[in-house]
From Swiss-Prot:
<feature type="binding site">
    <location>
        <position position="2"/>
    </location>
    <ligand>
        <name>Mg(2+)</name>
    </ligand>
</feature>
<dbReference type="GO" id="GO:0000287">
    <property type="term" value="F:magnesium ion binding"/>
</dbReference>
<keyword id="KW-0963">Cytoplasm</keyword>
<keyword id="KW-0275">Fatty acid biosynthesis</keyword>
<keyword id="KW-0808">Transferase</keyword>
<protein>
    <recommendedName>
        <fullName>Holo-[acyl-carrier-protein] synthase</fullName>
        <ecNumber>2.7.8.7</ecNumber>
    </recommendedName>
</protein>
<dbReference type="GO" id="GO:0008897">
    <property type="term" value="F:holo-[acyl-carrier-protein] synthase activity"/>
</dbReference>
<keyword id="KW-0460">Magnesium</keyword>
<dbReference type="Pfam" id="PF01648">
    <property type="entry name" value="ACPS"/>
</dbReference>
<dbReference type="InterPro" id="IPR008278">
    <property type="entry name" value="4-PPantetheinyl_Trfase_dom"/>
</dbReference>
<dbReference type="GO" id="GO:0005737">
    <property type="term" value="C:cytoplasm"/>
</dbReference>
<keyword id="KW-0443">Lipid metabolism</keyword>
<keyword id="KW-0444">Lipid biosynthesis</keyword>
<comment type="function">
    <text>Transfers the 4'-phosphopantetheine moiety from coenzyme A to a Ser of acyl-carrier-protein.</text>
</comment>
<dbReference type="InterPro" id="IPR004568">
    <property type="entry name" value="Ppantetheine-prot_Trfase_dom"/>
</dbReference>
<comment type="similarity">
    <text>Belongs to the P-Pant transferase superfamily. AcpS family.</text>
</comment>
<feature type="binding site">
    <location>
        <position position="51"/>
    </location>
    <ligand>
        <name>Mg(2+)</name>
    </ligand>
</feature>
Length: 119
């Protein structure tokens, strides 16, 4: 689980612009966020989700598991999911389930590392 203050994300984005986004997200993630009615809330939500995922994996952000090792995307119904671009990121037979929420002040995300097939 992770919670992010939207003001923190806003300050980083105001200071570094797209460079900030390119450091923590893939191009597809960036485009998804910038298309949203509240781009900062979407950016904060994905940031929180990425933090929650690395906590669930027990690794944190490292040289081996970095911001772009996986993407936080949405299925056609809008449900968030994790797509790994790094072979072996997840333990064999495991999947990750995520949930993201936000309000005017913060974004929160939860990630669960699940054994067994994806559902």
């Amino acid at each position: 689980m992770d919670i992010v203050d939207l003001v923190r994300i806003e300050k980083a984005y105001d200071r570094y612009g797209r460079k900030f986004l390119e450091r923590i997200m893939t191009g597809e993630e960036i485009e998804l966020c910038l298309k949203k009615p509240s781009p900062l809330a979407s950016i904060a939500g994905r940031f929180a989700a990425k933090e929650a995922v690395v906590k669930a994996l027990g690794t944190g952000i490292t040289a081996a598991v970095h911001w772009k090792s996986f993407e936080v995307l949405n299925d056609p119904a809008g449900k968030p999911f994790v797509r790994s671009s790094q072979p072996g990121l997840l333990p064999e037979g495991c999947s990750i389930k995520i949930s993201i929420a936000h309000d005017r002040h913060s974004a929160v995300a939860t990630a669960l590392l699940c054994r067994g097939p994806e559902s």
